[in-house]
Swiss-Prot record:
Pore-forming protein that forms cations-selective hydrophilic pores of around 1 nm and causes cardiac stimulation and cytolysis. Pore formation is a multi-step process that involves specific recognition of membrane sphingomyelin (but neither cholesterol nor phosphatidylcholine) using aromatic rich region and adjacent phosphocholine (POC) binding site, firm binding to the membrane (mainly driven by hydrophobic interactions) accompanied by the transfer of the N-terminal region to the lipid-water interface and finally pore formation after oligomerization of monomers. GO terms for cellular component: extracellular region; nematocyst; other organism cell membrane; pore complex. Composed of a long N-terminal alpha-helix and a core region rich in beta-sheet structures. Before the pore formation, the alpha-helix binds the lipid membrane, partitions into the lipid-water interface and stabilizes the monomeric molecule on the membrane. Finally, it traverses the bilayer, thus forming the transmembrane pore. Phosphocholine binds at S52, V85, S103, P105, Y131, Y135, Y136. A motif (Cell attachment site, crucial for protein stability) lies at residues 141-143. One of its GO terms (molecular function) is identical protein binding. Residues 103-118 are annotated as: Trp-rich region, which is important for the binding to lipid membrane. It holds the Pfam family Anemone_cytotox. This is DELTA-stichotoxin-She4b. It comes from Stichodactyla helianthus.
Length: 175
């Protein structure tokens, strides 16, 4: 299994994320997430909060500098109208928290794929509040395009999310 593991940051590719998607099987709404830590510090997993859907893996506990975490989410099993919508948090050795949100909706007539990343001051676990802050803040559409922003605290983000129901999201956090 790839999801729930750590790999060398330089080896984080869409091909790796394709393998993570394959592991999830025939599910109509799913996502493979890869986040490369080039921040200069180590990250420690806090938790994941699923607004909709679930995961079959545990967040990798430690993500050293120059390594990338692999994670995944999927809709609930069975004929249910849910997507894969979540926020998760990592405590950074700088004393702040990296919050990440993704949304792969069930109904594309009304919704689109969305994602965002933010650094929170101090230690903060992912919850409904973090999800809402990221989802209703200024998120990026999963539009198959690269996006960049300054995260503050001397860090930058560059990332992409695909628009499909079997989504891939790749993010790099760097100085």
């Amino acid at each position: 299994a790839l999801a729930g593991t750590i790999i060398a940051g330089a080896s984080l590719t869409f091909q790796v994320l394709d393998k993570v998607l394959e592991e999830l099987g025939k599910v109509s709404r799913k996502i493979a997430v890869g986040i490369d830590n080039e921040s200069g510090g180590t990250w420690t997993a806090l938790n994941a909060y699923f607004r909709s859907g679930t995961t079959d893996v545990i967040l990798p506990e430690f993500v050293p500098n120059t390594k990338a975490l692999l994670y995944s989410g999927r809709k609930d099993t069975g004929p249910v109208a849910t997507g894969a919508v979540a926020a998760f948090a990592y405590y950074m050795s700088s004393g702040n928290t990296l919050g990440v949100m993704f949304s792969v909706p069930f109904d594309y007539n009304w919704y689109s794929n969305w994602w965002d990343v933010k650094i929170y001051s101090g230690k903060r676990r992912a919850d409904q509040g973090m999800y809402e802050d990221l989802y209703y803040g200024n998120p990026y559409r999963g539009d198959n395009g690269w996006h960049e922003k300054n995260l503050g605290y001397g860090l930058r983000m560059k990332g992409i999310m695909t628009s499909a129901g079997e989504a891939k999201m790749q993010i790099k956090i760097s100085r």
